[in-house]
């Protein structure tokens, strides 16, 4: 770990926590885990995996488990990311839970991503374009809301639920492939198999 005022750090792995100079209570396990030059606001983070939390600078109370998990995250608090490449391109994220391979992996935002829950393979995946305004969205299931780029307050539960929706807010889709063909949708309630 760094040499200034780092306190209570645990680092296991090549280059883990190497540049941290003023953080406290961080745990990094894996090659380059939590290895960015970090400010004294970097507190109580846990990063386990290859390049997990690689760019963290000032983040607090986040848990990242899996290769490349939160590797572009520079700031934010209280994120939980489990799985390879979870939340891997978001730079500012707050209060998010991402569980599963590539879950929320391509969410890039000009503003902070806040209050999202994504569970399942590539749930709420996003794309490499500028993703904005998806706050307070829930995506549970294989590919649920996986191309959403703009639209807050959505809830999709079920494999492929809302899987074609790129734009739209305040939708509720429940069931296998529910709302799977709607590219742009707002304020809908869709329940049932392929509804």
Can you say where each PLM-predicted feature lies in the sequence?
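Glycine- and small/polar-enriched repetitive beta-structure motifs of secreted/surface proteins
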Residues: 1-195
